[in-house]
């Protein structure tokens, strides 16, 4: 069973492409002294953790910088070619993640649509529009609700096939790796003008409908990214709610998939600003005490394009992130209270 405390283990992973910083003579060898797990040579993919951005050839409406969309593999899952996608996925893994380096955590990062029809909002709404259009053209006499229901069914059935087959293939061809999709379980709660962090009843029942995915995952990887604009108690509430839902889902399955939230060291709404020491402590503490199995520290390559930025991150690791990570892992290992 999942025990909150004492914990069997709690691992903090480094999933930031800091190998780019080697070009500027900035290295992150100190990760080890802070008990942070990383790949050898600081590679982005390897024996500890590997992230695959938009792998294979998922049917997608890819939003371009000029605001238009590029249609890939027929655009939406109900029109897409599964074979083309899986062949491309295998080829990519062979190129960038050969068996000899594979192990640890494997993360499929795909966000061009969500498998629950209703959740395709904002930039993803185009998936709903196209799906509805396809049915409307076939059945011009149907009323709006019939069209939407059919569009939703077709979309969700095909989306499930693409996500499930990809996951099963990944597990089959890289057996040593523990696989999961980035950003799930996900909650769509609250209107945009009034954010709510609670996972509402509808979101929870939709997540239960996704048991076909979670039952096949070795790890659940919800994302916990903070906004600077939030008040301190709102930030804590956000972390608690995201974790509560992931733990609830994990407990639904005999194999109790690990819960490893993705945590970004910058604010979502102010990417130039690193999280304050207080925010790091509060979020790490909440992640630990709410029952997660670890934390994945995430960052993106465009934050590491010059020496100055690399040095800024290195300093942040040395002064704030590293010491806090060390205290958290030490408290778990020694079964002592966390003193910040």
Swiss-Prot record:
Keyword Glycoprotein: yes
Gene Ontology annotations of biological process type: carbohydrate metabolic process; defense response; hyaluronan catabolic process
Residues carrying a glycan: 66, 81
Gene Ontology cellular component annotations, sorted alphabetically: extracellular region
Pfam hit, one: Glyco_hydro_56
Record's comment on post-translational modification: N-glycosylated on at least two Asn residues by identical heptasaccharide units composed of Man, GlcNAc, and Fuc residues in the molar ration of 3:2:2.
Disulfide bridge positions per record: 21-310, 187-199
Expressed in which tissues: Expressed by the venom gland.
Purpose: Has no hyaluronidase activity.
Name this protein carries in UniProt: Inactive hyaluronidase B
Organism: Vespula vulgaris
